[in-house]
Amino acid sequence: MRPSPLHLAIQRYAGFVTFHGPMLAQDLLAGRQAPTEQALLDMVSGRLGAGSWIAAPPQARLATLASGVATGRLIGGNLALLAALTGTRYAIDARDGILFFEDVNEALPRVDRMLAQLRRAGAFDGVRGVLVGSFTRLLGVPGDGEAAQAALYPLVREHFQARGIPVLA
């Protein structure tokens, strides 16, 4: 099982907090980054409690797609897996929360379809805010940095603008 469905099942049925971060096998162990590794150790050891904020690295930038203020539990994961869980007992329930999603190796039309599927299924109902994570290697979009990520912004705005909630990417 991939992490997103496992996170959702643990949160919903066991009531436990789960941690999202770099994929252990692919990202964390292969290219270990001291700040990421330290943050993980601080969280699992209890040095960082619930609600603690970990500063983003200096090179990280957020784009405000819709301004506002929101509080709530952070829930989400890989967009393709969230869409695949639609209609199952493990489907995402982000009511009163801040929805986040990310993905890798997806094309813009597929991202649009997955967002539409989730929206039509009611997955965005009651969401207080949205955080768009990294979409690495967007198929059909040149580059892999901020310019490529910005190709998503019109799609994201289209799916969330009528909700009047803050959206960061």
Segments and roles (model prediction):
Residues 113-169:
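C-terminal active-site/capping subdomain that shapes the small-molecule cofactor and substrate pocket
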Residues 74-112:
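Oxyanion-binding "anion nests"
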Residues 14-16, 70, 95-96, 125-128, ...:
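Short coil/turn connectors at secondary-structure junctions
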Residues 19-22, 101-102, 131-135:
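Short beta-strands and strand-loop turn motifs
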Residues 15-81:
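Conserved anion/nucleotide-ligand pocket segment
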Residues 10-11, 66-67, 74, 91-93, ...:
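Solvent-exposed alpha-helices and their adjacent loops that cap or buttress functional pockets
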Residues 1-23, 163-166:
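Short, acidic/small-residue loops that bind anionic groups at enzyme active sites
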